[in-house]
Amino acid sequence: TTIIKMLSCLTKPTSGDILVGGYSTTKEPEQVKRLIGVSPQETAVAPNLSVKENLELICGIHSFSKGKTEEKIRELSGQFALDTVLKRKAGKLSGGWQRRVSIAMALISEPQILFLDEPTLGLDVIARHELWETIRSLKGKITIILTTHYMEEAEALSDRIGIMKSGKLLAVGTVEELNALAGTNDFETAFVSIVKEDTVV
């Protein structure tokens, strides 16, 4: 979560700098913000607004015309199957639906990079798998950086995985590469081995 906040210019690093798309998060935050969309761990939906009003709010922040706003809401409603809940208060939706709306809101500005911070935290198994399908539908269209504590989720969704401990990036690679590094065929076992070793590789 702290890394996501630094990458999205919400928190400044205590030292050093981060480049996103070639822009500095500390010196050029406005340029970075134009490149990214963020669905935070605490969903960004306004609970007292309808789903449609939430989407309209973000379109307004980006100064979309009425026509572009309507077009964008139609597009996202189809992409995220929101048609049946557009008029419902966001706060009355399940956690899975709220997360889906939050991701749709993050995509309104058509970012190049989407940050998903613990997207399925607190969801039941069915809602989690449904959201996985939503995230899979975005692959190939946009760069997604996702944080998770669920090994199964990382394995199911990621092309490349970075393993972190106490703010230190220990290893980066595909599931197969990380398994080979740890000498196992099981990713959860590989994760435990790499974290216990606590050595950057």
Q: What are the roles of these predicted feature ranges?
A:
Residues 56, 60, 67-85:
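Conserved ABC ATPase "signature" region
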Residues 172-173:
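ABC ATPase "signature
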Residues 8:
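Helix-to-loop junction immediately C-terminal to a conserved catalytic motif
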Residues 48, 89-93:
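Conserved ABC ATPase signature
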Residues 108-112, 141:
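A short, proline-enriched helix->beta-strand linker immediately N-terminal to the Walker B motif
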Residues 114-117:
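Catalytic Walker B motif of ABC-type/P-loop ATPase nucleotide-binding domains
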Residues 128-140:
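Helical segment within the ABC ATPase nucleotide-binding domain
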